[in-house]
Amino acid sequence: VFLKIMLAQKERRKLKFFRLFEELPNGEYTVKKISELLSYSYTSTQKILNEMEAEFQDFFQEDFSLLTELGTVQLVPTNLNYDTYYNYLIHRSIPYRAIICSLTEPDKDLLSFCKENFLSRASAMRQLQALADYVQEFDLLFNRSQLTFKGDERLIRITLFNFIWAASRGTEKSLNVLAKQPIDEALLFLQHEIPLLQDYVGRREIHLFAEIMYQRIRQGYYVVDDTRYEEAKFSENQRVKTTLVEHLAIPPEHLDAEFHFIQFMMFYAPTFQFPEDVRIAQMPSFSGHGQVLMPLLYKLDNYWAAEILPGDTSFPDNKVVHGNLFNVLFCYYIFPKRIPTLFLLMSYFRRKQTTCYKYLKGKYSVFLKKMSRRKDLQWLTTCYEDLADLFAWLTLDIFEEHQFREKLQVALVMESNYLFSQEIKGFLKDLSFIELIPFSPEHLPKTDFLITSSAMLIPEENHLPYVVFNFFDGETNYEKLYANLKRNYRKKCYANMAHNTDESQTS
């Protein structure tokens, strides 16, 4: 999602070209060969290579030429890597420059922006359309003609933070108005409430958010307060409020709302990493009279033991997972329609939806939909699917760890010669999910997988999966063996999971 918003199709193709350059063996390649490897036409390949050649001059000046005098392509030197080129394209992109412009030059309209970036108004409008469409999902409006955002100020700041952080990781030079030291001083007294301040990357995140906050306040945009923040019992530290007024120029009438929103941002993402996090000890206090989120989590504990992992009562002991579940719930409690998160901009998770993930998401959907019928939880109606998705990812590891305790039973069907078996036994010993057992045709029902030196050694009645390691022709592909073992291990675990689920439903 992030790349499709930030980069035009041609720029995304350039990244594919660069990735190919990193994978190819050293040497020179014809334009035709590159076009064939990427399945692009010769003409479009030539055009993209010419543009990349011009861009690389920003890195190499006259020291390197992508296209040789003979018209061949030589690979990029190793001192320019994919990540550097990726960041280069992102920072040059029109959507990213428009976002930065909206913060640092609020008086600049689209025509001035186009003149500065040497592009037509029509081209700019077209390149900014994906950004406008994306923010509209959260009831925000991005006015492309004025380069301004309208809507809930809290969601605007979160959206700006997401894009700028994903693009710059806090290194955007134009957002360095505030000296870092005053920000640290202003937030020093919130060290317990904001553990991110004790983390190297966390401090960068906070500094970036403070810069965005400062720029928006400077333009006259303020957040509104929200009584629902009481679910997390925010601090009212007057000393911190005073330093915020001094360093961020917050008018007194907006101070409480801005201070509360700063604290909300500590719950904006699943930021719990360690059981020692001081906020974990505070969580039981969130279940007082009138509060709904912690009681909902307690109900989830019971549901886990009854429906998700029948009989497992250890789920409440995982404080880090519970802290992150609370954070996610809290975000959607405040913004039930949908909240823009970095998670939604990532494509990584969309490609790794395992059977366990789908099982968990289905279970959470049933639970949250049922809970949404209660009067104090009707806000779940609009967001239970999003929550089920996040809950599934947050609990996937502990669920799989529990499911995958049983090992894959592997037997060797090969000559009784230690020279044959010692290497493969050593390989299997390093795999934590494998248990090597003696082979016997009578024990086939207790065996999951066979490794043999010849298919001729496999018993006729065998129905188990197997791999042949023929030592005489050198067919000993350990990578292929590992992938095969892992695939069968997961298949066994999923079968056990389905069996246990059926048993719990019939009992």
Predicted regions and their residues:
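A cross-family "folded-core" feature that marks the main globular domain of proteins
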Residues: 2-507
